Amino acid sequence: MEHTHAHLAANSSACGLGFVPVVYYSFLLCLGLPANILTVIILSQLVARRQKSSYNYLLALAAADILVLFFIVFVDFLLEDFILTMQMPLIPDKIIEVLEFSSIHTSIWITVPLTVDRYIAVCHPLKYHTVSYPARTRKVILSVYITCFLTSIPYYWWPNIWTEDYISTSMHHVLVWIHCFTVYLVPCSIFFILNSIIVYKLRRKSNFRLRGYSTGKTTAILFTITSIFATLWAPRIIMILYHLYGAPIQNPWLVHIMLDVANMLALLNTAINFFLYCFISKRFRTMAAATLKALFKCQKQPVQFYTNHNFSITSSPWISPANSHCIKMLVYQYDKHGKPIKVSP
């Protein structure tokens, strides 16, 4: 993320928001970090209990959000800009910047396979458990993490476009456009297309009730996450492109305020997912309350009952109960590697 405070620290009047950024980012870190850690704990229990692909993706998303809060909110904004009030040496600073881009790209792109997973679950339910299963999900998550890190290496040369003496180059334009495409335009296009298909499918079959708790709740969580992401990240993308192609900076103070607000909104996305899950999912809300109660009372949580094998029944969610006897149910159990094994009914 761009540095706008360190080079303005010598002139306190240059920071139009005063102490608002440091208070905001401190609050965001103190709120978001425990919330995401609690999310990881709860989703880890759900993954062990139910072996659902969607829980694995949400778990990976929470882990990526923790990395974003650490590298960007703590190291970049709080430690460097407000505590040290000076920029780090060039090489360590650039390495941290690569890790920042890697974490934010991972946080965004881990939602893409989750969207694809929900699309298959809703639109192709009979194929869902042969396409999406725990072993494959873990491979997809690992691939996203590795790919996002490797593709973030070129951001070692990311320019600070907000300095007054910045000189634009063609390489900088390429990096900025790649950033805008990879963190916003491409993911939002995928979210919009697949979510539109899912909504169309749900509306077309609105006279039937969804079978299964997780399909409806997870899909609602997906819609909420992607909608909030598109809304909160839009100001940052607009600011970057406007500054790159708009008029030269005439009022650095105003630009500084606008960029601060844009970054605040974008990073808010990493701290609120826990509260969205609690609002939408009763199961998640109940487990969160139980975990917090056990934590504050320093007691172990009750031992949950786990079966030796995880079973799931795959059928179309649009089949009415009256005609369900005409449909052959496909029952899958997972082996020790998380791959589905079809069992004859």
Swiss-Prot record:
Keyword list, A-Z: Cell membrane, G-protein coupled receptor, Glycoprotein, Membrane, Receptor, Transducer, Transmembrane, Transmembrane helix
Stretches of the chain found on the membrane's Extracellular side: 1-21, 79-94, 162-173, 242-260
Glycosylation, residue list: 11
GO molecular function annotations of the record: G protein-coupled receptor activity; identical protein binding; neuropeptide receptor activity
Major localization class: membrane
Organism domain of life: Eukaryota
Subcellular location: Cell membrane
Tissue: Expressed almost exclusively in the brain. Abundantly expressed in the ventrolateral region of caudate putamen, the habenular nucleus, the zona incerta, and the medial mammillary nucleus.
Gene3D superfamilies hit by this protein: Rhodopsin 7-helix transmembrane proteins (1.20.1070.10)
A Gene Ontology term for the protein's cellular component: plasma membrane
Membrane topology: Multi-pass membrane protein
Pfam families: 7tm_1
Cytoplasmic compartment residues: 43-57, 116-140, 195-220, 282-345
Coiled coil, from the record: none
GO biological process: G protein-coupled receptor signaling pathway; phospholipase C-activating G protein-coupled receptor signaling pathway
Transmembrane residue ranges: 22-42, 58-78, 95-115, 141-161, 174-194, 221-241, 261-281
Function: Orphan receptor. Seems to act through a G(q/11)-mediated pathway.
UniProt family annotation: Belongs to the G-protein coupled receptor 1 family.
Protein name: Probable G-protein coupled receptor 139
Originating organism: Mus musculus (Mouse)
